[in-house]
Amino acid sequence: MKHSYFISDLHLSETQPELTALFVDFMQNLAPQAERLYILGDLFDFWIGDDEQSALIQQVKDLIKSVSNQGVQCYFQHGNRDFLIGERFAKDTGVQLLPDYQLITLYDKKILLCHGDTLCIDDEAYQQFRRRVHQKWLQRLFLCLPLKVRVIIAEKIRAKSNQDKQAKSQEIMDVNQAFTAEKVQEFDVNLLIHGHTHREAIHQQEEFTRIVLGDWRKNYASILKMDESGEFGFIKD
């Protein structure tokens, strides 16, 4: 039966090879069987520009390119850790870059896709930070810096983010229910798929269904499968 996959929040990095191993297994064994693959952000733990090169980056690029070359339509939506992924990465992998909110039709279902961080409006400090780093002039300036400098800046930002999370409540870091409902209504859909919060779940709400993709962990890959009958669910070992 025809089907597609949705994943997010893998946070791939050299420091967690077990996550890379899960991704390799998925891309070699499951992904080639799909019609479409949607990666909804935070594929990498951080991204400092398309000009960065490493064995991990090349391995990930090659895996995606291989799946794309086998006829799978691959899509990428930016996360809060890899929002600087650009056209060079897209060209190298064959993915199509998606905007912050993307409306798709899949197996006769209208679906709204987003990474999920834009729905967490109660986290005002993060939203201010997000608006700042998404300014195009600031991104261009950052990308002009030497790679070594960018790495230092990215590591400091990541450390500050991890520190800030310790002081924030779980409620603040989750989606705002009213705002999320407004977005669903704005795009006139009854199915929303997002990641970011690392709280894998399928929420059947009154007016719509909200599917939250989970983060990938040492022994678990959060993979949502949707088939042509319209059925969907997370793959369980």
UniProtKB/Swiss-Prot annotation:
Involved pathway(s): Glycolipid biosynthesis; lipid IV(A) biosynthesis; lipid IV(A) from (3R)-3-hydroxytetradecanoyl-[acyl-carrier-protein] and UDP-N-acetyl-alpha-D-glucosamine: step 4/6
UniProt source species: Haemophilus influenzae (strain 86-028NP)
Record family assignment: Belongs to the LpxH family.
Lineage summary: Bacteria, Pseudomonadati, Pseudomonadota, Gammaproteobacteria, Pasteurellales
Enzyme Commission no: 3.6.1.54
Subcellular locations according to the entry: Cell inner membrane
Cofactor list: Mn(2+)
Annotated binding of Mn(2+) 2, by residue: 42, 80, 115, 196
UniProt keyword Transcription present: no
Membrane topology, from the record: Peripheral membrane protein
Reaction equations catalysed: UDP-2-N,3-O-bis[(3R)-3-hydroxytetradecanoyl]-alpha-D-glucosamine + H2O = 2-N,3-O-bis[(3R)-3-hydroxytetradecanoyl]-alpha-D-glucosaminyl 1-phosphate + UMP + 2 H(+)
Xref: Pfam families: Metallophos
GO molecular function: manganese ion binding; UDP-2,3-diacylglucosamine hydrolase activity
Matches recorded under CDD domains: MPP_YbbF-LpxH
Amino acids binding Mn(2+) 1: 9, 11, 42, 198
Sequence positions that bind substrate: 80-81, 123, 161, 165, 168, 196
Keywords of the record: Cell inner membrane, Cell membrane, Hydrolase, Lipid A biosynthesis, Lipid biosynthesis, Lipid metabolism, Manganese, Membrane, Metal-binding
GO biological process terms, semicolon-separated: lipid A biosynthetic process
Major location (coarse): membrane
Cofactor binding note of this UniProt entry: Binds 2 Mn(2+) ions per subunit in a binuclear metal center.
Protein name per UniProt: UDP-2,3-diacylglucosamine hydrolase
Function, in words: Hydrolyzes the pyrophosphate bond of UDP-2,3-diacylglucosamine to yield 2,3-diacylglucosamine 1-phosphate (lipid X) and UMP by catalyzing the attack of water at the alpha-P atom. Involved in the biosynthesis of lipid A, a phosphorylated glycolipid that anchors the lipopolysaccharide to the outer membrane of the cell.
Gene Ontology cellular-component terms listed: cytoplasm; extrinsic component of plasma membrane
